[in-house]
């Protein structure tokens, strides 16, 4: 009979990856990042544990969406007060806080529980090509989110 192996949290190897979001499709990029944060790309994946890696996303202001989503996609937030609903389009939010667009997309693809909140802290999003995590010696990860007609 096979035995179920649970990875030891102390011995897990958590790597750091850098992903360039320039000219990448938002949803496809977010789904790839969510899988890495969750650890689904590793043989040690366990649904109830944090087995994923850290992800740094640079050039968040250059992420793109297809179709008319740049003018029609809405981001909503509420202050909690009566009449406190704020609505912003993709274009306006990208001009104001481009990191929040990528964070919002990835957060929606993580579990909606305490594990998901813990995994979300392992995502670092920056505008521009630089980041302050050189000490962690992150690996560059190439993500191709532009679909081609080849199957």
UniProtKB/Swiss-Prot annotation:
Tell me which InterPro entries the record gives.
Ribosomal_uL13, Ribosomal_uL13_bac-type, Ribosomal_uL13_CS, Ribosomal_uL13_sf
Listed GO CC annotations: cytosolic large ribosomal subunit
Cite a single GO BP annotation. translation
Q: Give GO MF terms, alphabetically.
A: mRNA binding; structural constituent of ribosome
Q: Does the keyword Ribonucleoprotein apply?
A: yes
The answer to whether the entry has keyword Nucleotide-binding is: no
Keywords assigned by UniProt, alphabetized = Ribonucleoprotein, Ribosomal protein
Position of the signal peptide: none
Which Cys pairs does UniProt list as disulfide-bonded? Answer: none
The family annotation for this protein states: Belongs to the universal ribosomal protein uL13 family.
Q: What does this protein do?
A: This protein is one of the early assembly proteins of the 50S ribosomal subunit, although it is not seen to bind rRNA by itself. It is important during the early stages of 50S assembly.
Q: How does it assemble?
A: Part of the 50S ribosomal subunit.
Q: Which NCBIfam families match?
A: rplM_bact (TIGR01066)
PANTHER family referenced in this protein's UniProt entry, alphabetically: LARGE RIBOSOMAL SUBUNIT PROTEIN UL13M, RIBOSOMAL PROTEIN L13
Protein name, as recorded = Large ribosomal subunit protein uL13
Q: Which organism is it from?
A: Rippkaea orientalis (strain PCC 8801 / RF-1)
The organism's taxonomy opens as: Bacteria, Bacillati, Cyanobacteriota, Cyanophyceae, Oscillatoriophycideae
């Amino acid at each position: 009979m096979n035995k179920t192996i649970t990875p030891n949290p102390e011995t897990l190897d958590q790597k750091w990856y850098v992903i360039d979001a320039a000219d990448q499709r938002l949803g496809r990029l977010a789904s790839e990042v969510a899988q890495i944060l969750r650890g689904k790309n590793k043989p040690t994946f366990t649904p109830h544990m944090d087995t994923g890696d850290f992800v740094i996303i640079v050039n968040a202001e250059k992420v793109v969406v297809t179709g008319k989503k740049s003018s029609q996609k809405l981001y909503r937030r509420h202050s909690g007060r009566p009449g406190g609903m704020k609505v912003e389009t993709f274009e306006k939010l990208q001009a104001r806080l481009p990191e929040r667009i990528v964070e919002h997309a990835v957060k929606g693809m993580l579990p909606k529980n305490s594990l998901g909140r813990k995994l979300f802290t392992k995502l670092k999003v920056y505008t521009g090509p630089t980041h302050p995590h050189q000490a962690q010696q992150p690996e560059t990860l190439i993500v191709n989110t532009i679909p081609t007609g080849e199957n």
